[in-house]
Amino acid sequence: MNVFIKITFSFLLLLNFSATAQIKQQNIARIDQMPDLPKPLQIIDYKKLALDFDKTVYDFKAKGKFWPMVWIDTSQKNFPQPVVGLYTAVGDVRQGSNRNKGMFHEALATMGATLGATLVGIDKKQHFNYVGMLKNYFNKGTNWNIMMNNTCPEVALLGGGYGRDWWYDVYPNLLFYAVYDQYPNEPGFEEIAKTIADKFYEADVILNGNYEYSYFDYNTMKPMTNHICAQPDVAAGHAWVLYSAYKKFGDQKYLKGALSALSALEAQPKNPTYEVLMPFGAYLSARINAEHGTKYNTAKMLDWTFDGTPVCREGWGALVGNWNGIDISGTFGSTVDHGGYGFLMNTYDAAWPLIPMVRYDQSYATVIGKWMLNAANASRFFYPQYMPDQHETIPELAEVTKGVIAYEGIIKQSGYKEYENLKAPVAQGDGPLWVLGENPKESQFSVYGSGHVGIFGSIIRETNVKGILQLNLLTTDFFSDKAYPTYLYYNPFTTAKTVTVATKKAEKVNIYNTVSGIFIARNVSVSSKIKIDALDSAVLVFVPADGKITYQDNKMLVNNVIVDYNFQQIK
């Protein structure tokens, strides 16, 4: 009798779970154009790739042509300490200890690699303190007093947009704040973080809702215009940093600044997307709506992120397409350049805000799960070991990558005359164009983009069902409140599938699905089988089995920890 009751109870749980989701799922038109199940399907082990990248690239004794990829810059800019330099691209002639006094290295590369490694469990303070070295990018010598893409103006014109291309000046501050979240006790970081937030707050006050500028001079505190497009999506970068500062330090000024910058972004009359910052606006919209009861238009910001409709930065967004039997959908970059040109770093970094966004608005669970499956599948093709040789510009030179460095991009038709007859998709990179006639062919391999692999590596795990991923919604949800383990699962198949989800041993949990608004399993101590309907999703939260459930406004909590931000939406 008892056995029958247990079996019946489990059966009812599965029935309840496979019913129509009570949180209505929203669409994103661009993602609707992507395949539910991309082909050929193969999800590589991004965590292992991130671990291998760190071990291989941060080897000062590495042998081989163009190796090692790191050096020590002893110029002591901004702080009396050395800083590690990381090549932007393989063989880049601008870089290394003997070029430009060893000073030309980019925060996008070093901060991205530091963050990526940390997210997969590597302590970047061991041996050398690579974390503390990042302080050298804090440009106090110029009185800008923010993190910048280089350590000083002496190398500004070599590339990387220093002091003239707004996203290049703002994005390193997001990277720094993410690293700060992971290393909160690093000496000097708190003061730097507050100084950056103060600068961004003051800039937002001066801008007063108008972000239609090419860059902002954070020394003179004046917005500037040059030949580069206006970049109003920088408001998303300001807002993300300011909200992170608010969560960290509790100063209402920072919240006010975040809301102001986000409102400026939302008020844009046309798609303001420029490079990488727009998805942070979508994430912040969902999060602030959930945490503060605001009504920011998350749907509009997600459409802007994906749909490829910006005018000045023409076509920038998510790519869609099957090129000669290879799905490249989900990669981010230009949707129009030579038929479409997706970039590795942009694709990796889009997951940083978009995946944790689902915690705060589970109505996007299915569509974001679908995008992530496409992006995770397509991103392997940036790597020469996974892209067929006939679709690469320099497969004969791939050995130099040591299996951890990818091409910078994937393009429909190569922009290089000598490769224009290759069939799409074509893996290539822009490195040779940066220093014409000097940068080698191998500079098509992107060290800077490859260093961000830890973002994917920290989020993506395969399940027992090929094609259904487990996506960790917490790893890149920086400066978040306490949360229980939370995962997104998307079923790309036209039939229901049963997925085995594991829990920590010796800890009994109840499993709650924020999409259906019910507990789907109780007192689980090892694993549980979860049924997911066709083309549906689940956001599973693993809460203490003996936890006390309470409600606050439209939130459901267990032991005073928010589990569902939108509980009252469920009918």
How would you name each of these model-derived features?
Residues 178-252, 260, 264-267, 283, ...:
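Active-site lining segments of carbohydrate-active enzymes
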Residues 203-207, 215-219, 268-280, 284-433:
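Extended ligand-binding clefts on enzyme/binding-domain cores
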